[in-house]
């Protein structure tokens, strides 16, 4: 459960992402594909090379979903319901992959926002991404 301090940290950190969300989302996806090659199996129709328009497009979708989650941090299950349905029923993404992408997002944010990425912010973002992952996998049951 996110504390009020966690919510403040997440909103402040995500606010610093600004217009770079799509770029950071794409970078996190590239990190995931390189570090965890089995995740590529969910994107057989994508050009997964560095700078690919498809990876950039999906990175923007990831960032937009996280922006939505930040904006609705007190009601993420409702805000992410359609996305949860999509990943559970149509795409059938293995839930472990959300943890892998979350890790890669944390690394990407730490690399781009070193001054803002304090231990407290790191912990808050980790809890937030774990909450998002929980919501996205809730329809698997």
Curated annotation (Swiss-Prot):
GO terms for molecular function: haptoglobin binding; heme binding; iron ion binding; organic acid binding; oxygen binding; oxygen carrier activity; peroxidase activity. Gene3D superfamilies: Globins. Heme b binds at residue 87. The keyword Protein transport does not apply. The modification Phosphoserine is found at residues 3, 35, 49, 102, 124, 131, 138. The modification Phosphothreonine is found at residues 8, 108, 134, 137. One of its GO terms (cellular component) is blood microparticle. Involved in oxygen transport from the lung to the various peripheral tissues. This is Hemoglobin subunit alpha. It comes from Semnopithecus entellus (Northern plains gray langur).
């Amino acid at each position: 459960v996110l504390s009020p301090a966690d919510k403040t940290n997440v909103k402040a950190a995500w606010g610093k992402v600004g217009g770079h969300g799509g770029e950071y989302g794409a970078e996190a996806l590239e990190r995931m594909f390189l570090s965890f090659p089995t995740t590529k199996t969910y994107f057989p129709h994508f050009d997964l090379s560095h700078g690919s328009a498809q990876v950039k497009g999906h990175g923007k979708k990831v960032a937009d979903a996280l922006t939505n989650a930040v904006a609705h941090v007190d009601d993420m299950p409702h805000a992410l319901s359609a996305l949860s349905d999509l990943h559970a029923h149509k795409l059938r993404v293995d839930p472990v992959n959300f943890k892998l992408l979350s890790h890669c997002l944390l690394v990407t944010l730490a690399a781009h926002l070193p001054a803002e990425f304090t231990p407290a912010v790191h912990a808050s973002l980790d809890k937030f991404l774990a909450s998002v992952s929980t919501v996205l996998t809730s329809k698997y049951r």
